[in-house]
Amino acid sequence: MQRDVRTGGPAGRGRKSVTLLAALGSCALVAASAVPAAAHGGGGGSGGGGGGGGGNRYVALGDSYTSGPLIPRQVDANCARSDHNYPSIVAGRLRSATFEDVSCAGATTEHMWKPQGTNGAQLDAVGRNSDLVTVQIGGNDIGFGSIIGTCAQLAPQDPTGNPCQRHYSDSGVDRLTVAIARTGPKVAQVLQAVHARAPHARILVVGYPDLLPDDGSGCAPAVPFATRDFPYLRDTGKHLNLMLRLVARWNHAEYVDTYGPTVGHDMCKSPADRWIEPLQPTSPAAPAHPNAKGEVAMAGAVWQRLTHGRGGH
């Protein structure tokens, strides 16, 4: 993802989760009601993406967490797209008859419909013959790249406190919670558009991995956030994933949890154990992004969903 009601304690974070759920409930249910009845069969079409047989027509939509910036081998410099990102790994396992990866670093939901530099509108790659579509989007809509930069810049003001959380809550409302809630209907519109273009496709909404540990001690200097901002940023990531999970459920798509499988491999871990690079990377990958091992882990989560049925969301 490139681009004073104080809530410092557990009770504050609980209220924030309730607020997020309420906002998403009112917005995403309205958005979900707009899905045409014919599109509701998207999760159970005849094409199917599961299993390992040939003949699959797979399209990958997404941002930099999908494209894999700086991970060798880069095959599209304009979108920082690697041929070892998770869509490429999944496509290799599927032995897809056709595979089109149009993910692009910096993409927001609007780039599903609008060109992004030389990368065309991502939804243009989806057609009636598509039978598997993965979507990983939303992080840039909330400005996650700038959030990371802001929190790093504010940390020296109060190294053991939560200056970043205070910054985003200075109006009495947590602005990141609001941004996540506002992004929900945008993601819903993307899923509706995929359903309309590929009515028989299996649609997977891919969540974001675990970036940070619960306790930020020992993370500096590679991850220079204030101590009490670590749980705030961690919870923001969880709220983003919760939104994606709910919007997927309400729009007849399947959610892929990449957070759980990556816990313990965040950017504060040793180079041997980390799957997310810190702000000063030691492996070829973008700061605060999955490295090659992280892309493999996300591919594993997608594959697990593909091969273990459609029952859960």
Question: Where on the chain are the PLM-derived regions?
Answer:
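Catalytic His-Asp segment of secreted/periplasmic serine-dependent ester chemistry enzymes
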Residues: 209-313
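A structural motif corresponding to the C-terminal end of an alpha-helix
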Residues: 92-97, 186-202, 236-257
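Serine-esterase "nucleophile elbow" of acetyl-processing enzymes
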Residues: 44-106, 123-124, 152-158
